[in-house]
C-alpha cells in the first residue's frame, strides 16, 4: 500500500451435498511509517494474522446449522522512530506496544416449519486478550463476552412479525500488575423484543419495533424504534427513522484508551448510570440509468441527529487520578452524508 503496508488474503468455499465450508485467511503488515519526518509514527508497525473457517450443515430441506471460528493475532508497535529501529536511548525512548488476541465462535440454527413460520437461534462467544505497554506502565486484561438470541418469525402476505429473547454477558478480569484498584467487572443483560414489518401500500413500508432490556445495577431500558420507507417514484425514494438506545458504563472509552487506562478509577455502580441516546435520521435516494442500462447513477443524501443524555466523560480528580462520570445534561451531534455512485455494467 502507499503507507508501507502489505495485505495478503485467501478464500476457499465448497459444498458437498449436505455439508459446506468456507475458509478465509489473511496477513496484514505495516512497516514503520513517518511521511512528515516528525520522528514519530503516523502509522505504527504491526503484524496481523486472521483465520476464519466456517462449517455449514444442511440437515434437512428446512433445517440448517452453521458453526464458525474467527481467530486474530496482532502485534503493534508505535512511538519514536529511533526506538522502533532499535536505536533507542534516553532521548528516543517513547513507545506504545499493543499485543492483542481476539477469538470468537459463531453458531446459528434455523428451522422453517412451513412457508410462514421460522425458528432461529444465534450464539457467539468472544475471548479478547490485550497487553498495552508504554514506558514505566503496562495494562493487561482478558475480556470474555457472550451473546445468545432465540427468535420466532411469522410471515403473512403483507406483514412479518418477529419476537425473541436475548442474553448478553460481559466479564473482564485485569491482570493486576500494580497495587492500583482493580477494574474487573461482570455484566449480564436480559432482553426481549418484538418487531413488525408492514407493507402498508405500494408506496409505504413501515418497520416498528420494541425492545426491553434489564441491566442489573442500572435498571430497565425500554427501546422503541420506527422506520418508514416512502417510494415516491420508481427512481426516487426516502426513508425516515428514529429510535432509542443505551450503553452500559465501562472503563473502555476513547478518552481512557488515550491514557492506556493509567490512573483511571473503576466504574462505581452506585454513582454511574446508563448513557441513553435518542436518534432521528432521514435520507433521500435517487437511482437512474443511461445507455440502455449499461451506465447506472445513484445519489443518496442522509441527515441525522443524535441526543445523548447523561454522557460518560473522563474527568480528573484532585489527587491526580481519573474518574468516568455521567455528567448532568446532554451532548448532541448532527450532520449529513452524501454518497454518489456511478457504475458501468459490472463495474
Predicted regions and their residues:
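Transmembrane beta-strands of outer-membrane beta-barrel pores
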Residues: 1-2, 16-18, 27-31, 71-75, ...
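Outer-membrane beta-barrel translocator/receptor signature
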Residues: 1-36, 44-51, 62
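Hydrophobic, lipid-facing positions within transmembrane beta-strands of outer-membrane proteins
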Residues: 6-10, 49-53, 69, 101-107, ...
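Short loop/turn motifs that connect adjacent beta-strands in outer-membrane beta-barrel proteins
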Residues: 17-19, 61-64, 112-118, 155-160, ...
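Surface-exposed extracellular loop regions of Gram-negative outer-membrane beta-barrel proteins
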Residues: 18-35, 48, 118-133, 160-169, 171, 183, 216-221, 230, ...
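Membrane-embedded beta-barrel scaffold of Gram-negative outer-membrane proteins
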Residues: 19, 118-132, 231, 239, ...
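Flexible loop and strand-edge segments within Gram-negative outer membrane beta-barrel domains
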Residues: 30-49, 56-119, 125-143
